[in-house]
Regions:
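Structured core elements
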Residues: 22-23, 40, 75, 82, ...
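Short, glycine-/Ser/Thr-/acidic-enriched flexible segments
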Residues: 1-3, 28-29, 44-47, 80-81, ...
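Generic secondary-structure signature for well-ordered alpha-helical cores
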Residues: 16-22, 68, 98-101, 133
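Hydrophobic, well-ordered secondary-structure elements that form the walls
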Residues: 39, 76, 93, 128, ...
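Short acidic (Asp/Glu) and glycine-rich catalytic loops that position anionic groups and cofactors
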Residues: 39-45, 75, 162-164
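Cysteine-nucleophile active-site neighborhood
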Residues: 46-116
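Phosphate-binding active sites in nucleotide-utilizing proteins
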Residues: 3-55, 61-66
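Amide-donor transfer/coupling interface in amidating biosynthetic enzymes
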Residues: 100-185
C-alpha cells in the first residue's frame, strides 16, 4: 500500500536477470523476509501512512539492521523518504541522514537527468513529489539532478550510504542496464 509505484518494466528486468521478487509489507509484516539478497523500495505515499509505518518499530529496526549490515538497497522517492530519519517529524527508519517534510505544492515534476557524482555516470529519470528533504548533520547529497528540458536548472538530490542508493528520481532500469547490475551485484 505505502510503496506501490514501480515501473513494471523494472520488475520484469529484475526477474529476467534472475532476481526472485519477494513481496512484503512495511505496514503489516514484523520484519523483512529471511534470506534477502537486496531490497527495492519503490515510490508511493509514505506520508499518508507515516503513523502506521512509524508504529511498526520491529520492521523499521529490521530494515535498518539489514542496511547497516550491508544489504544492497535501491530506494526511490517514497522508499527513500521511508529510509530517512523522519517525515514531518514522524520517525521513520532513520538509516539515511536526512529529514523529509511535505509541502503544499509540487516540488519537482518531469523528466530529469541524474548525475551520480561518485561514478560520473548520468541516467535519465523522472521526478514527481510534494516532499522536500534536508540533509542532517555532515551528510551530503551524491547526485546532481538537472531538468531534462532545461539543463541549466539543477539541484542536489539523492545519496549513497553503505550499499544503499536512494533518491527522489524514478529510474528506468533498461535505460542503463549496467546501473541495475551495479546495484544488485
Amino acid at each position: 500500500k505505502a510503496f506501490s509505484f514501480y515501473y513494471r518494466a523494472n520488475l520484469d528486468a529484475l526477474e529476467a536477470a534472475g532476481v526472485e521478487l519477494v513481496p512484503f509489507s512495511p505496514l503489516e509484516d514484523g520484519e523483512l523476509p529471511k534470506g534477502l539478497d537486496g531490497l527495492y523500495l519503490g515510490g508511493g505515499f509514505p506520508e499518508v501512512f507515516k503513523v502506521r509505518l512509524s508504529a511498526n518499530i520491529s520492521m523499521r529496526q529490521s530494515i535498518r539492521t539489514a542496511l547497516e549490515s550491508g544489504l544492497p538497497c535501491y530506494a526511490e522517492c517514497g522508499g527513500m523518504m521511508y529510509l530517512s530519519e523522519s517525515i514531518d517529524s514522524t520517525e521513520m527508519v532513520g538509516f539515511l541522514p536526512q529529514v523529509c517534510r511535505m509541502t503544499d505544492r509540487l516540488q519537482r515534476f518531469g523528466y530529469v537527468l541524474v548525475a551520480d557524482l561518485k561514478t560520473g555516470r548520468t541516467y535519465p529519470a523522472h521526478e514527481f513529489h510534494h516532499a522536500a528533504t534536508e540533509a542532517a548533520g555532515e551528510a551530503a547529497y551524491d547526485f546532481e539532478i538537472r531538468k531534462a528540458s532545461r539543463p541549466e536548472l539543477c539541484w542536489p538530490g539523492g545519496m549513497h550510504k553503505g550499499n544503499t542508493t536512494a533518491g527522489f528520481a524514478h529510474l528506468h532500469f533498461l535505460s542503463h542496464p549496467e546501473w541495475m547490475e551495479r546495484l544488485w551485484r
